[in-house]
UniProtKB/Swiss-Prot annotation:
Top-level taxon of the source organism: Bacteria
Transferase is among the record's keywords: yes
GO biological process: tRNA modification
Reactions catalysed, as given in the entry: adenosine(37) in tRNA + dimethylallyl diphosphate = N(6)-dimethylallyladenosine(37) in tRNA + diphosphate
Known partners and oligomeric status: Monomer.
Gene: miaA
Family: Belongs to the IPP transferase family.
Name listed for the protein in its UniProt record: tRNA dimethylallyltransferase
């Protein structure tokens, strides 16, 4: 039997294998500091839901929690692969599914924290990823066709197989286009079919979603300041080191915010000031896309951190979390 975590009035708070607290929101909104505070107060451990923090040696540009912070509260799904390796959403989902029972066994509350909506969705809703081996031969064939005839040529193949998926993808999103074709060739069923099957099953974890946001002007100021701090901390040297240590950086790592802009500068495509300007602009645009993604979800409990009374807001979040843990 799992021991109670905390006394709360006359009740006890118990973690549960199917229970998960989620803290989400755009970049630079303040997720890290709030999640650390909440984890201390409800005896939690943090699982990162950030698609860039999975990479080793990419520290400054991904704004990882410091080693000191990680020593206070255990963090997972940070520094798990090298930047020259690929990592799929399916792998992320599987690893988190394996982590949660261990966290609960230690009488801790799993807290999923991040801004990568696809990762959060994969854990909570689950994707029915077909179990199949990679078809390297087919992938190479399709990649060669894309080089010879253009991405649209391969995209049109997907359009014939899975028109619903094709509508959601840009022809230049070649990796996902090829994946859609590969799934059909390997299983005889489309990605759209697997998605619809998943939707019939409902959420995989009982969850509380806490969304953080700030007024646009304040958020953008925080983003600009964060970029300036990253540059001061040595982001340019970090990118130089990465390119030396990992000459074959994965496409995902190479295209990461803060990395693609500095890589362009190091290639002399533009000067240092332009790299910083681009990084600030691209990060602001990314934050906007994150909010657009999250606002589709009607189950998120939103908190505006721009109101000025942080103690009151945090108190509400803590109470909401405790009540959620009690109510099962």
């Amino acid at each position: 039997m799992i021991k109670p975590l905390t006394n709360h009035g006359n009740k006890n708070i118990y973690p549960d294998n199917s229970t998960l607290i989620v803290i989400l929101g755009p970049t630079a909104v303040g997720k890290t500091s709030l999640s650390l505070q909440l984890a201390r107060d409800i005896n939690g451990e943090i699982i990162s839901a950030d698609s860039m923090q999975i990479y080793k040696d990419m520290d400054i540009g991904t704004a990882k929690a410091s080693q000191k912070e990680r020593n206070i509260i255990p963090h997972y799904m940070i520094d798990i692969i090298k930047p020259d390796q690929e990592f799929s959403v399916a792998e992320y989902q599987a690893m988190v599914d394996n982590l949660i029972p261990g966290i609960v066994y230690r009488n801790k509350v799993p807290i999923l924290v991040g801004g990568t909506g696809l990762y959060i969705r994969a854990v909570i809703e689950g994707f029915l990823f077909p179990e199949m081996d990679k078809n390297i031969e087919l992938r190479q064939k399709l990649q060669k066709e894309a080089q010879q005839y253009g991405n649209k040529y391969v995209y049109n193949k997907l359009k014939k197989i899975d028109p619903e998926l094709a509508k959601k993808l840009h022809p230049n999103d070649l990796r996902r286009v090829i994946r859609g074709i590969e799934v059909y060739h390997q299983t005889g069923k489309t990605m759209t079919y697997f998605k619809k099957e998943k939707q019939k099953k409902g959420d995989r974890y009982r969850n509380l979603k806490i969304g953080l946001y700030r007024e646009r002007e304040e958020l953008y100021k925080r983003i600009n300041k964060r970029v300036d701090i990253m540059i001061e901390q040595g982001l340019i040297d970090e990118v130089k080191y990465l390119l030396t240590k990992y000459p074959d950086l994965s496409k995902t790592a190479r295209q990461g915010l803060g990395y693609k802009e500095i890589i362009g500068y190091l290639k002399r495509e533009y000067d240092r000031e332009e790299a910083i300007r681009l990084l600030k602009r691209n990060t602001r645009r990314y934050a906007k896309r994150q909010l657009t993604w999250f606002r589709r979800d009607q189950d998120i409990n939103w908190f505006n951190l721009s109101t000025g009374d942080y103690k009151k807001i945090y108190s509400e979040i803590k109470k909401l979390s405790r009540d959620f843990l009690l109510d099962f």
